[in-house]
UniProtKB/Swiss-Prot annotation:
NCBIfam families found in the cross-reference section: IV_pilin_GFxxxE
Name of the protein described by the UniProt record: Fimbrial protein
Organism the protein comes from: Dichelobacter nodosus
Gene expressing this chain: fimA
Gene3D superfamilies for the chain: Glycoprotein, Type 4 Pilin
Keyword Transmembrane: yes
InterPro entries listed in its UniProt record: N_methyl_site, Pilin, Pilin-like, T4P/T2SS_Core
PANTHER family reported in the protein's UniProt record: GENERAL SECRETION PATHWAY PROTEIN G, PREPILIN PEPTIDASE-DEPENDENT PROTEIN D
Pfam families per record: N_methyl, Pilin
Membrane topology: Single-pass membrane protein
Maturation propeptide residues: 1-7
Protein's cellular compartments: Fimbrium; Membrane
Membrane-traversing stretches: 8-28
Alphabetized SUPFAM superfamilies for the sequence: Pili subunits
Length: 161
């Protein structure tokens, strides 16, 4: 009587392992980019939260809070899990005939890796900076001091060439 052998041969198993290895070689870098992009998006969220503070400061003719501000003031920065956003710049208050797409002189500098202590940040964006320049209409555009790789900059603020 003949006995039937069941199962996979060594060659078949090696082919499956090779296919999984090839798929992983493409998937892991793409996943790392996805994580870095999602962490970089937090910076724009922090900057959006600072818009109200900037508007309050502009009432006093300055982008940043006065050093002698009262105890109830929030300050010129906001910290998230992965980033620190800080208001800066000089308000262009004497400019006349400004259009909504003109810059008002205020900036928000987002430094990645300076967020909440213990938060693990992607090495692709750690210590990178995204500078945002505020427009007269309150929205942001990418500033010149940005060191963050272009693929991680949120599309809403990406500079057009």
């Amino acid at each position: 009587m003949k006995s039937l052998q069941k199962g996979f041969t060594l060659i078949e198993l090696m082919i499956v392992v090779a296919i999984i290895g090839i798929l992983a070689a493409f998937a892991i870098p793409a996943y790392n980019d996805y994580i870095a992009r999602s962490q970089a998006a937090e910076g724009l969220t922090l900057a959006d939260g600072l818009k109200i503070r900037i508007a309050d400061h502009l009432e006093n003719g300055s982008c940043t809070e006065d050093a002698n501000a009262g105890a109830g003031e929030k300050g010129n920065q906001d910290t998230g899990k992965y980033a620190l956003a800080e208001i800066g710049g000089t308000y262009a208050q004497d400019a006349t005939n400004l259009k909504p797409e003109d810059k008002n002189g205020c900036t928000v500098t987002i430094t990645y890796g300076k967020g909440t202590a213990g938060a693990k940040i992607s090495k692709l964006i750690d210590t990178k900076v995204l500078e945002l320049e505020q427009l007269v209409n309150g929205s942001y555009t990418q500033g010149g001091a940005t060191t963050l790789d272009a693929k991680f900059i949120p599309n809403a603020v990406k500079a057009t060439k």
